[in-house]
Structure formats: structure tokens, C-alpha cells
């Protein structure tokens, strides 16, 4: 399946279709969208965002704790879309504040 991913970035909103078996960060890059990242393994906070609507699966990540995930935090490098989803990107400073 594919879902519509909407990224709300400081430069504006980007939308694309993302297969449910491709990480959101990887597919955004294929679409030419530049997002922050570092480890690409779900073990840091460089790519952190906040889910504003919809659902993701980020069980491959290790950096976020359950409370942060419940609050809507997401690591785009290890997140699969599970529905149409809206994510506010570039949130590392807010997450680690």
C-alpha cells in the first residue's frame, strides 16, 4: 500500500505518496526533499519530527522512549507510514530542549 505523506517544513509544505515499506526519510529524498538526518538508524534525534495527523510505524528506532512516541515524536529515518500522515519536520531542538 501507499499513503500520502505531508511534510510541514520551515520552507513550506511538501506532499508525496510513500509506499508503506519505505522509510519516510528515504522516500522524501527520492522525491528531492531535503530533510535533516545523521545516523539513519533511529538512534539519534537529527531527523526528529512531530506527527500532526495519521499513524507511523517506527519500531526499528531506539532513540525515542514510549512516552515520546505517544506524544507524537517521530524519527523519519526509521518511520513507515501506516496511514495518510502529516509530519512537522526539523523538530530536533524542540525534542531535545
Curated annotation (Swiss-Prot):
Record GO cellular component, one term: chloroplast stroma
InterPro entries attached to this UniProt entry: 2Fe-2S_ferredoxin-like_sf, 2Fe-2S_ferredoxin-type, 2Fe2S_fd_BS, Beta-grasp_dom_sf, Fd_pln
GO annotation, biological process: electron transport chain
Record carries keyword Iron: yes
CDD domains: fer2
Cofactor(s) this protein requires: [2Fe-2S] cluster
Protein function: Ferredoxins are iron-sulfur proteins that transfer electrons in a wide variety of metabolic reactions.
Protein name: Ferredoxin
Amino acid at each position: 500500500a501507499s499513503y500520502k505523506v505531508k511534510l510541514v517544513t520551515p520552507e513550506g509544505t511538501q506532499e508525496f505518496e510513500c509506499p508503506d515499506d519505505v522509510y519516510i526519510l528515504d522516500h522524501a529524498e527520492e522525491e528531492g526533499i531535503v530533510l535533516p538526518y545523521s545516523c539513519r538508524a533511529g538512534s539519534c534525534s537529527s531527523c526528529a519530527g512531530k506527527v500532526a495527523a495519521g499513524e507511523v510505524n517506527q519500531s526499528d528506532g531506539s532513540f525515542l522512549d514510549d512516552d515520546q512516541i505517544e506524544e507524537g515524536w517521530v524519527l523519519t529515518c526509521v518511520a513507515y507510514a501506516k496511514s495518510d500522515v502529516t509530519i512537522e519536520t526539523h523538530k530536533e531542538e524542540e525534542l531535545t530542549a
